[in-house]
Amino acid sequence: MSQSWQFWALLSAAFAALTAVFAKVGVAQINSDFATLIRTVVILCVIAAIVAATGQWQKPSEIPGRTWLFLALSGLATGASWLAYFRALKLGDAARVAPLDKLSIVMVAIFGVLFLGEKLNLMNWLGVAFIAAGALLLAVF
């Protein structure tokens, strides 16, 4: 298995693109919140099978409290994001919803600097600006 973060990030992007297309079709005839529930159940089953099959299960009692807290917060943010995303897909075109959703990249860059102490150079900030501009051009015009 590849240990390259770039490989996994590109794979994530490819699956995220498929997610937008599949989700747009999937929410066409049902409530977007219920569609999110179905998606979540599928993800839970698949990830549980992967963790079990690869022997990656960990004892919950051995996981530090801080880890539980931040994973719970991440889960809540993910759920809110998915609910909003599916509602947006129900109401709008996938080709316009997905780029606007990807403004999360811009927000992550800002939050990373503000809260995680990460550093971005001038070229990085230029890239962030281009992503923001591109997302807005795709979604608004």
Swiss-Prot record:
It holds the Pfam family EamA. Signal peptide: none annotated. The keyword Transmembrane helix applies. It is found in: Cell membrane. The chain crosses the membrane at residues 7-27, 34-54, 69-89, 97-117, 121-141. SUPFAM superfamilies: Multidrug resistance efflux transporter EmrE. It is a multi-pass membrane protein. Keywords: Cell membrane, Membrane, Transmembrane, Transmembrane helix, Transport. It comes from the Bacteria. Residues 14-140 form the EamA domain. GO terms for cellular component: plasma membrane. InterPro entries: EamA_dom (IPR000620). Belongs to the EamA transporter family. This is Uncharacterized transporter in cobO 3'region. It comes from Sinorhizobium sp. The lineage of its organism: Bacteria, Pseudomonadati, Pseudomonadota, Alphaproteobacteria, Hyphomicrobiales.
